[in-house]
């Protein structure tokens, strides 16, 4: 969620006290689609890092004083006039530098090498032959071995900068890995951050720990303690309102803030009538009775379902739900009165996007349901305790705070809820059918021990009826679609390969136990070309 600049902390991703407390790495973003994966790999090693677009990198470097720098990949060509460059200050500072793909190319060009447009492009899996020992390869690769990596490049180095030597080659990249170990400079033409480079995380760890000498002092326990101090300093004696969606992000934010300021926090849970089976009761019980957090529970289901009657366009559904949520939340906040701050579950990817490489908006695939308009309308300051964390780190923090794993480990659930899992017009009867089918599906997944393996699973009620036979009678009922995907970040996803026995058993249960369904299908579409949700 993004709020107006005058109410948010400074837009630059480096504006945080965490950077001042820990050893850190600066990641200079040249526009790669997988730059966030670099940060996740670094943080997995217990080292704090931040992603900054190349245009802001010099200021960020001066402010952060990082112990090392990683230059990301990117879509540009180094030999083209006006292509992005790393601040020369980085190479003059004496800190270790690792360049990945485009980062390797610009490092080579800036340090006196030659880069040309590649005559032999490499995209996808490739094999790198190790030519010499390297601190980067220590304990991972040995000279003479070949290892699978993931390439995505068009340029290539034709002459190395002074002081560099070749550490690895590939069939189309004679300088696949280059190094200047005296200055601790390393360039990789492949992407170590992606899972398709099996040893990539180990190579990054060698750069972070062994080459850069960072000890890994950034833990979730430390983050918790530091963030509590920050919240107390920011809020003082003020009152905070937090909108609960029933999801993990807002729940973790609320529990952390409550630990910091106690009953100065009031949570507002708007039940729009589009939640999963028994979900509203679970949220109310968790916050009211387990954590004793002041909670206002608003049952606005009749309002939402009334406004959604006859609405079939998915974007219209999302916008209607978002508008009503803001109206209801604002009304409840006025009833509470005296609140100075609004808490939001903003995550680090949202912050990165706001200071993105391009500086402009991405193509809107689907509008996002959030309360981003609330701060401007209500003249409230933001409290965003999760703005330095990725989604997987939020789950770790949730466990650190004692949230039950069955809650913290739940699959992602969209803000518009079941409205976008019920294509076409939404009715109470359709929602009842969908809730029951979804609950059976998730129950079967849990019983099979697959819930934590699957990134996201859910049922969809299709706006289609088909002929069936039950007993001696003809039926004409709805079709339920089942969706399950594996993913690391939700950006790409593959359908989960259930065995046919599981699918058969699940379909049988749904048809036998849910009145109004006579057919079940399984969605085997990956992302791309499809999206995870159907609407």
From Swiss-Prot:
Its EC number is 6.3.5.2. ATP binds at residues 245-251. Residues 218-410 form the GMPS ATP-PPase domain. GO terms for cellular component: cytosol. It comes from the Bacteria. Transmembrane segments: none annotated. InterPro entries: Class_I_gatase-like (IPR029062), GATASE (IPR017926), GMP_synth_C (IPR001674), GMP_synth_GATase (IPR004739), GMP_synthase (IPR022955), GMPS_ATP_PPase_dom (IPR025777), NAD/GMP_synthase (IPR022310), Rossmann-like_a/b/a_fold (IPR014729). GO terms for molecular function: ATP binding; GMP synthase activity. SUPFAM superfamilies: Adenine nucleotide alpha hydrolases-like (SSF52402), Class I glutamine amidotransferase-like (SSF52317), GMP synthetase C-terminal dimerisation domain (SSF54810). Pathway: Purine metabolism; GMP biosynthesis; GMP from XMP (L-Gln route): step 1/1. The keyword Zinc does not apply. PANTHER family: GMP SYNTHASE [GLUTAMINE-HYDROLYZING], GMP SYNTHASE-RELATED. Homodimer. Catalyzes the synthesis of GMP from XMP. This is GMP synthase [glutamine-hydrolyzing]. It comes from Bradyrhizobium sp. (strain ORS 278). The gene is guaA.
């Amino acid at each position: 969620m993004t709020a107006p600049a005058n109410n948010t902390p400074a837009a630059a991703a480096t504006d945080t006290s965490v950077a001042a407390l820990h050893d850190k790495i600066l990641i200079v973003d040249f526009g790669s689609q997988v730059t966030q994966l670099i940060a996740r790999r670094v943080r997995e090693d217990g080292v704090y890092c931040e992603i900054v677009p190349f245009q802001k990198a010099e200021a960020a470097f001066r402010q952060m004083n990082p112990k090392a720098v990683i230059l990301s990949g990117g879509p540009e060509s180094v030999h083209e006039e006006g292509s992005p460059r790393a601040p020369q200050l980085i190479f003059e500072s004496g800190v270790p530098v690792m360049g990945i793909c485009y980062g390797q190319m610009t490092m080579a060009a800036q340090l006196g090498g030659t880069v040309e447009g590649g005559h032999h492009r490499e995209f996808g899996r490739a094999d790198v032959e190790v030519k010499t020992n390297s601190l980067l390869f220590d304990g991972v690769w040995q000279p003479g071995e070949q290892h699978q990596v993931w390439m995505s490049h068009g340029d290539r180095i034709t002459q190395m900068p002074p002081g560099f030597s070749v550490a690895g080659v590939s069939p189309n990249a004679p300088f696949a890995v280059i190094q200047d170990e005296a200055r601790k400079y390393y360039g990789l033409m492949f992407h170590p951050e992606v899972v398709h480079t099996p040893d990539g995380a180990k190579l990054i760890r060698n750069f972070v720990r062994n080459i850069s000498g960072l000890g890994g002092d950034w833990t979730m326990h430390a983050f918790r303690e530091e963030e509590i101090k920050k919240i107390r300093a920011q809020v003082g004696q003020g009152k905070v309102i937090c909108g609960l969606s029933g999801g993990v992000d807002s729940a973790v934010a609320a529990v952390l803030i409550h630990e910091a300021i106690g009953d100065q926090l009031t949570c507002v849970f708007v039940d729009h009538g589009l939640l999963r089976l028994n979900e509203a009761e679970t949220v109310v019980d968790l916050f009211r009775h387990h954590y004793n957090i002041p909670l206002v529970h608003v049952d606005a289901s009749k309002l939402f379902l009334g406004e959604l009657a006859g609405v079939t366009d998915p974007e219209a559904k999302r916008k209607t739900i978002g508008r009503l949520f803001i109206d209801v939340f604002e009304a409840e906040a006025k009833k509470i009165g005296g609140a100075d701050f609004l808490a939001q579950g903003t995550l680090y990817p949202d912050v990165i996007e706001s200071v993105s490489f391009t500086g402009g908006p991405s193509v809107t695939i689907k509008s996002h349901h959030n309360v981003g308009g609330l701060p401007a309308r209500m003249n409230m300051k933001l409290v965003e305790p999760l703005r330095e964390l990725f989604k997987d780190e939020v789950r770790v923090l949730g466990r650190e705070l004692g949230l039950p794993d069955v809650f913290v480990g739940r699959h992602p659930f969209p803000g518009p809820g079941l409205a976008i899992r019920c294509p076409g017009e939404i009715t109470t009867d359709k929602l009842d059918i969908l809730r029951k089918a979804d609950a059976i599906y998730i129950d079967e997944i849990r019983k099979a021990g697959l819930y934590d393996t699957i990134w996201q699973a859910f049922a969809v009620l299709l706006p289609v009826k088909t002929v069936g036979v039950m007993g001696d009678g003809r039926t004409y009922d709805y079709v339920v679609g089942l969706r399950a995907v594996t993913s690391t970040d939700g950006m790409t996803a593959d359908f989960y390969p259930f065995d046919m026995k599981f699918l058969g058993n699940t379909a049988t249960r749904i048809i036998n136990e849910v009145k109004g369904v006579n057919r079940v299908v399984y969605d085997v579409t990956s992302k791309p070309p499809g999206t995870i949700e159907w609407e």
